[in-house]
């Protein structure tokens, strides 16, 4: 469905849209910054943020406390100590055309218009596509390093950063401030990435997607020796907290970094005009493919530090800097075949297998074709894509790595289409289990779903494997050591068919050992065949012992009492994501109560009138719960699972006699003694309701530094306003 124009949104529609955007963007931030696994292009992500900002500008009273405009990146991942940045690590505004760059320059000239004789200079440098890091030096000695995280709080990765040769343990030369935080980008070269992939393939290890994600994952290793083996690089380009400016200008400051022992970009230049900046942009773009590492644009900054300070910041971004993004790189190749993969909810996902081609330094061999309509040349709304030209086996296609991450087909070269190429016939049966694959009809719109789904459910091996992979994944039970490869091995060996079987693997240790040994033996034979070398002194399968099994079994046992929301998410119920699972856990408190209500709802003539009214749970989720709990085949699977796993009840302790019980509270601005989530949880425990926007129903506004439109609106409405210290005194936490 096409998005409704911002100018046409009602206040209630805008509020709902801001909620949706906050959740969706937070999910993408987490996948990009914390999990190193983005699922949308940079352009699509930027479009979401622009829409969010446009709605906020039209409805300033609806700005949420968790708004994307108030944060950068994602909260730091678990497993590392947290580091609060003394100076936030902000994102940059984006420019996509030369006209956008002109607008940036003109905004600066208008801002400084009162200084007619002011000579504004700029810098231009490549935007490295890696992982941002902040390095704290005290008296010239490296004492702490952190990731960007959410911009305010990052992860302490000091030990890992010390393994990077480009990061000096002690600054060279002299003249550095007593304390300075050097900021820059950790990245991996194409050569090192390909070497790592080759080493991993030879050892039967994991595959790696691209240099950016691999560098980020390498930097987050708990074992610093793993990071050291990855030969990561670092470019310095900025600074955070410092007791003194390195120099009067951006350019001179970065040159100082080189004097102190850092690598800096040799392509950084000064410029005075739009023409000079754009010329450098195109020069860097021409050299992009020969640099040996990923860049995704050029960053322009006002050169004079005094002018940077005067121009300031807006909505989490510096006004004095902009990132001019490159268009996605493209290449031409051929479609060799089209395969169908089956997901955990039965979705038939077509994948084009391509003649290998290098795009942006990465070899691309596969690209998703999304669904039946996409192959035919139409989007989910029936509108033409690729000029309405379908994709056929044998076609020559133009592909690009959207956002330099996700490969996609952008066009079909129709003049090169083979004479014998025929339209692709999308299967109407599951390629794995043979069950019918149907396109569901949306009861409200009467339209067909764009995706075909296998109706085999539990009898479909492909769905079973994907459900098992989901069950142990990071957002679900997060069982360490039980990744996709081990799940596949145990499933193919007949050791696990449902999630309950995972918890009895310890009892079948000999069979588990045999399955692992046979897999590794097969991998070794494949390497032997590829290399032409013959192994010597090969142990039999029965003679092998895997000490890591004890660790795996312990990890499995540690998940026998999971949090309720994680367990609900792990069940893999369609349309139940992490956020919805948390709402269900909070609403029903125990898995037994959720099952009871789910079965009652599924058995009702009109389920939507039976299911309790819960904020955040709509008809789509209710229908999904009915499908799951109303399916008798799921009963046995769930019963056996609950014999092995006892989810913890979701407990919310609420004080009904506190001073704020029953009141509606809004938090705004920067909280200095607790995080916003901690403040929200505290208020809810005390019986208060926490809202995201100020209205006539608001009883109390807790305002920290930087409070803006909410504070103004609260004053106009006569809402009581207090600061953080007063709030803590009022609730007895000072």
UniProtKB/Swiss-Prot annotation:
GO terms for biological process: DNA repair; DNA replication. Its cofactor is Mg(2+); Mn(2+). InterPro entries: BRCT_dom (IPR001357), BRCT_dom_sf (IPR036420), DisA/LigA_HHH (IPR041663), DNA_ligase (IPR001679), DNA_ligase_AS (IPR018239), DNAligase_adenylation (IPR013839), DNAligase_N (IPR013840), NA-bd_OB-fold (IPR012340). It catalyses: NAD(+) + (deoxyribonucleotide)n-3'-hydroxyl + 5'-phospho-(deoxyribonucleotide)m = (deoxyribonucleotide)n+m + AMP + beta-nicotinamide D-nucleotide. Its EC number is 6.5.1.2. It comes from the Bacteria. Belongs to the NAD-dependent DNA ligase family. LigA subfamily. This is DNA ligase. It comes from Mesorhizobium japonicum (strain LMG 29417 / CECT 9101 / MAFF 303099).
